[in-house]
């Protein structure tokens, strides 16, 4: 899914704008590099704002990024009897 990165907050988070299919914990990719993950979604339901925790606090990013909505491969690790 495509999102538009708007700006960087004073605390180092990135703010982006996207669509409603975004999940918390999803990976954010910019120019084929993982730049962070989604930590919060807020604002209007149709076109929410997305708070991204970057891997590197010194990162300067603006433009279009992509969010990869993957299910965790460690989701069901409990042993069945």
UniProtKB/Swiss-Prot annotation:
Gene3D superfamilies linked to this entry: Probable tRNA pseudouridine synthase domain (2.40.10.230)
InterPro entries membership: Gar1/Naf1_Cbf5-bd_sf (IPR038664), Transl_B-barrel_sf (IPR009000)
Lineage top rank: taxon: Archaea
Family the entry assigns: To M.thermoautotrophicum MTH886.
Name the record gives this protein: Uncharacterized protein MJ0782.1
Organism from which the protein derives: Methanocaldococcus jannaschii (strain ATCC 43067 / DSM 2661 / JAL-1 / JCM 10045 / NBRC 100440) (Methanococcus jannaschii)
């Amino acid at each position: 899914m495509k999102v538009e990165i708007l700006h960087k907050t004073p605390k180092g988070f990135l703010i982006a704008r996207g669509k409603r299919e975004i999940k918390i914990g999803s990976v954010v990719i910019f120019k084929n590099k993982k730049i962070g993950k989604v930590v919060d979604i807020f604002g209007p339901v149709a076109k929410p704002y997305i708070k991204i925790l970057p891997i590197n606090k010194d990162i300067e990013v603006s433009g279009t990024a992509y969010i990869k909505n993957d299910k965790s491969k460690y989701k069901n690790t409990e042993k069945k009897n």
